[in-house]
Amino acid sequence: MVDHDSVSLDWEIADGVLRRSNNREWRSACHIHNATEKRLMQAIEILETLGDDLDLSNDLRDAAVDVYCDAFRSGVTDGRVTACVVAVALCIASRRTGHPIPMSRLTQSEQVDETKYNRCYIAVCDALDVDLQLLSPSDYLAFIRGQLSGETDDQDPAAELLDAVGEDTQFVGKDPAGVAAASVYLVEQEHTQKEVAEVVGLSTETIRQRVSDLREVADDV
């Protein structure tokens, strides 16, 4: 039986306690005593792998661990694929920090099935009372900029382009991360469509179409 209430919000398991490691070398100090701890360590290992793949900050990883532990305590993780729960935890944590990660990028991992991720996302958000507010293309600019150059700009010309086209019906039902990536490509053209597509986990053809849409709408503004 899983003891959800015994979970601590730390990083490494030593002497039966999950502790945050200051030097992040938690693997060498772990002593796994039961199935509950095994599940937690598996989750953290998956989180580290996804974090490395996405070059995520330590602060964001810590925030995702907190979300995962909250989900674990609620019992919503029971019977669900651990990798999907971890990906959802990263998504929620990134939204809370103001730098949301595109869902399409999280589900690129071989460990994360998109259909199961979507179901898990709804379940975890319901269990943790997370607001399911829709995001706009501008919300994804910080993540895209960080992935492409490691920097963000308060005076982002891509944001100005997105503000100019507003909520045009041309983009209704379109992935906002794809629209954001297309705007970055258009205003800079320092990166290829393939590069910006990879950042948001979408196809080059999708970005090419969003670029075409943006050009068409911008010409009418």
What are these regions (language model features)?
Residues 1-221:
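Non-catalytic, interaction-prone regions of core transcription and DNA-replication machinery
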